[in-house]
Amino acid sequence: MERVDPSGPVYAEITIDLPGDLADVMEGSLAPEVERPTSERSQVKVVAGEGKLVIRIKASDVAALRAAVNSYLRWVGAILDIVGSIE
């Protein structure tokens, strides 16, 4: 296993399979968070297509990466809960 330099840029890519057009709905719902990040320590791209949502995160350090991953996964979970309660 390759060691990660905790001080240099670190990356994560999360792919989530979603039914129907839910990936597009999710992309639109996350757009405000992507466009106006709460921290300058991470950059995020969210792409939807073919029933998948892909979240790509680049962060300045491991702590910032962890925080961004946790935030986006929480937002995805919240959106899924809301969509589930509407259906």
Regions flagged by a language model, labelled:
Residues 1-87:
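N-terminal intrinsically disordered, cationic/polar leader segments
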